């Protein structure tokens, strides 16, 4: 938790941006693994609740009466039975005091607060809910059916939250740096362990254990797979094989709920083959190009398409692609190899604030998403970069057998793709290199003081260490 003043200042700015009405920010509740008496999944508080109210306990709601400048933390104190099973926790009053809030109330009072506001036709601002228990709570409080809540959520509040959370403060950057330290240890552990004979799940389990051992948790389920062509492939009991590539996409989340998100691709044997090195070097060049051009004022969509053109040019040199590069990228031919965007916002969420709808987070009135074209419709971040933004830089090249077959059968982008050559890469897998990047005053820099090896020689050298 940050200082009391941090949360006071954040709520003050939020009130100024929203202007009037009643703001309700729901914290999360415990989520059972399958049924409540059989245990709960690790608790994760709603990020916007954490941002403005700081408390990492279930069953809390923050209410801000903007017009009357009244802030209230709503929740019930635990009873003796809960204390017996789970131990004592701070009272709601104490938690409110820790973040500079003067008023508290039990959960049953929230219905009265909402009824009073509605009777006076005051605007009630809430964010789009993503959990069913919160959707049902909103239905009970405001009478808005769950199917309508996304549309009824306050755009004014969404835009205010996005504006504030998009630009990271100095203390937030410090937390992201802490997450990066743990992320470094997670990824270098994976590199040291990767060798023929182990299972994907074994390596992934060791990676997860690093996060836990530092008092953190994983920022998303760890991806460790020899099938790197599957974007979000789960680790399996497959045994690591000589000659294959292993892709590790993993990150840590600190005790204050700030994340890291990195991806590395490594040769199981410890040495890249010539063919692997050719593709890897293209991804490496695209990754480094982003670092050269990303800076305040630049549209990240422009960086994405510049990377696509660079990638396509280099794939033409290998005989995998052909034709005019500009026309090919305009037609979406690059999505055969890169069917996702260059990156996304990152912070308290790995895909930061995407619960507020990507069109509100990664885009704006100037830069709009293309939802029609395959691949381009997965571009999560397109708007102009600003100092203090944190984005991921994650180009990749994937050889997806089903996609190759589909496009070949349809003749899709046939004037730009050499399908005969692509057939010979169906067993290749995929390569992705991902880092977290802070936009600075005049450019950008990596988050994290120690670089996870990613240049081919550095990867091979690191994997060769005992």
Regions found by a protein language model. Give the residues of each.
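Active-site neighborhoods and metal-handling regions in enzymes and metal-associated proteins
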Residues: 1-466
């Amino acid at each position: 938790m940050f200082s009391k003043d941090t949360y006071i200042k954040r709520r003050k700015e939020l009130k100024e941006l929203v202007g009037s009405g009643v703001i309700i920010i729901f914290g999360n509740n415990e989520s059972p693994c399958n049924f409540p008496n059989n245990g709960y999944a690790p608790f994760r508080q709603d990020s916007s609740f954490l941002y403005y109210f700081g408390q990492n306990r279930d069953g809390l709601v923050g209410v801000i009466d903007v017009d009357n400048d009244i802030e209230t933390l709503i929740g019930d104190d635990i009873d003796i039975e809960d204390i017996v099973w789970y131990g004592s926790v701070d009272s709601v009053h104490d938690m409110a005091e820790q973040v500079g809030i003067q008023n508290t109330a039990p959960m049953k009072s929230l219905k009265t607060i909402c009824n009073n506001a509605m009777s006076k036709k005051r605007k009630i601002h809430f964010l789009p809910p993503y959990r069913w228990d919160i959707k049902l709570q909103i239905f009970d409080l405001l009478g808005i059916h769950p199917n309508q809540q996304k549309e009824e959520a306050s755009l004014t509040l969404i835009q205010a939250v996005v504006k504030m959370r998009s630009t990271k403060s100095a203390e937030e950057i410090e937390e992201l740096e802490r997450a990066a330290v743990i992320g470094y240890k997670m990824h270098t552990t994976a590199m040291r362990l990767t060798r023929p004979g182990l299972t994907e799940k074994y390596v992934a389990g060791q990676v997860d254990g690093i996060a836990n051992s530092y008092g953190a948790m994983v920022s998303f389920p760890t991806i460790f797979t020899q099938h790197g062509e599957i974007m979000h492939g789960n680790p399996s009991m497959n045994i690591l094989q000589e000659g294959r590539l292993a892709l590790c996409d993993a990150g840590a989340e600190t005790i204050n709920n700030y994340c890291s998100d990195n991806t590395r691709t490594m040769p199981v044997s410890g040495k890249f083959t010539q063919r692997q090195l050719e593709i890897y070097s293209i991804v490496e060049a695209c990754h480094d190009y982003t670092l050269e051009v990303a800076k305040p004022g630049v549209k990240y969509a422009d960086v994405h398409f510049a990377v696509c053109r660079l990638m396509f040019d280099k794939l033409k040199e290998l005989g995998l692609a052909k034709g005019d590069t500009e026309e090919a990228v305009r037609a979406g031919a690059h999505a055969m190899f890169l069917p996702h965007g260059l990156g996304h916002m990152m912070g308290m969420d790995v895909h930061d604030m995407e619960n507020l709808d990507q069109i509100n987070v990664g885009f704006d009135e100037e830069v709009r998403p293309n939802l029609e074209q395959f691949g381009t419709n997965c571009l999560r971040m397109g708007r102009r970069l600003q100092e203090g933004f944190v984005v991921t830089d994650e180009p990749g090249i994937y050889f997806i057998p089903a996609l190759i077959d589909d496009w070949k059968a349809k003749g899709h982008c046939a004037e730009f793709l050499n399908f005969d050559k692509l057939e010979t890469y169906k067993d290749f897998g995929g390569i992705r290199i991902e880092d977290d990047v802070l936009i600075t005053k005049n450019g950008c820099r990596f988050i994290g003081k120690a670089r996870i090896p990613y240049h081919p020689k550095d990867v091979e050298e690191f994997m060769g260490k005992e």
